[in-house]
Design a protein with these regions (language model features):
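Extended, charged catalytic domains and RNA/DNA-binding interfaces, predominantly
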Residues: 1-280
């Protein structure tokens, strides 16, 4: 569930227990105190809005198990900085530097970075609205929760992007000390990769560019990912369809759905109830 705060910014609770109680609190700080001893993450949400009007207040950030990560992207937009792609377009205003991720890093805070959809219409994971990536040894509930707690997370805006980043064998989110630096990086996306930046203290340490055109060694088997788009229709009208996709002289090894949820987040005028429509 979610709590709004003009003073501290909006926050979202993610509970381990499915029957966790709804906590009554007077402020976000009171909420954090009452959450101690419980398996719950309290995460700052759409952080880049104006301070004092639902934007994040970094003075209330508490490093630790309650808030191991913060939300950099959702369907509200991108809070990495007050510039760049995916601006905030909601009626709560444009982005403000003092609530952004880069501002929090400049203060010396340690936190993981994630994204989430904020899909009010019952479509968690809606394509293009933000998603979290977790590096865990297995897909069990305990393994995923521990990976979240230890900040082994990353953020993606739409496609699933696998990021395996290590510094002297430490994973994303770990804290290490050393006199030398050895970086390992492996990135796999659902489309061609334009570039990868390694950023340190607000400065680009290295940039790796992908090829402008696909590269396939002569005589090698062609391996590729193909994105299929279909539609379109008026956003308020639903269309029931069934489709089939096949390939000649080849094999389809996997399919990654890119289904989007409803194009709105609030009840529509004149509607007293909303029915979730399922893509599969």
């Amino acid at each position: 569930y979610e709590a709004h705060s003009m003073e501290h910014g909006d926050h979202v609770a993610l509970n381990y227990d499915l029957d966790a109680p709804l906590v009554e609190c007077t402020s976000i700080e009171d909420w954090k105190q009452k959450a101690k001893g419980h398996k719950v993450f309290i995460t700052p949400h759409h952080m880049g809005y104006q301070g004092g009007y639902r934007g994040y207040n970094w003075k209330c950030f508490t490093e630790g198990d309650i808030t191991p990560f913060v939300e950099m992207y959702s369907r509200h937009g991108l809070a990495e900085s007050d510039q760049g792609d995916y601006p905030y377009l909601h009626d709560m205003g444009p982005r403000q530097w003092e609530g952004t991720i880069q501002y929090g890093l400049e203060l010396g805070n340690k936190f993981g970075i994630m994204a989430s959809t904020d899909q009010h219409s019952g479509y968690p994971g809606s394509y293009g609205d933000g998603r979290i990536g977790v590096m865990a040894p297995s897909l069990t509930r305990d393994a995923i929760w521990e990976a979240l707690r230890t900040r082994h997370v990353c953020a993606a805006t739409g496609d699933k992007i696998i990021i395996d980043f290590r510094l002297n064998d430490a994973f994303m989110g770990d804290v290490v000390r050393g006199n030398s630096r050895r970086i390992y990086l492996n990135v796999t996306g659902e489309s061609c990769i334009d570039y990868v930046d390694i950023v340190k203290n607000g400065q680009i340490l290295a940039r790796m560019n992908g090829p402008l055109t696909p590269i396939a060694p002569e005589g090698d088997t062609v391996r590729c990912k193909v994105k299929v788009d279909f539609g379109w229709n008026r956003e308020e009208k639903y269309v029931h369809w069934q489709g089939k996709l096949s390939v000649d002289k080849g094999q389809i090894h996997s399919v990654t759905p890119c289904f989007r949820g409803a194009a709105f987040t609030s009840p529509q005028e004149g509607e007293t109830e909303f029915h979730t429509h399922v893509n599969r």
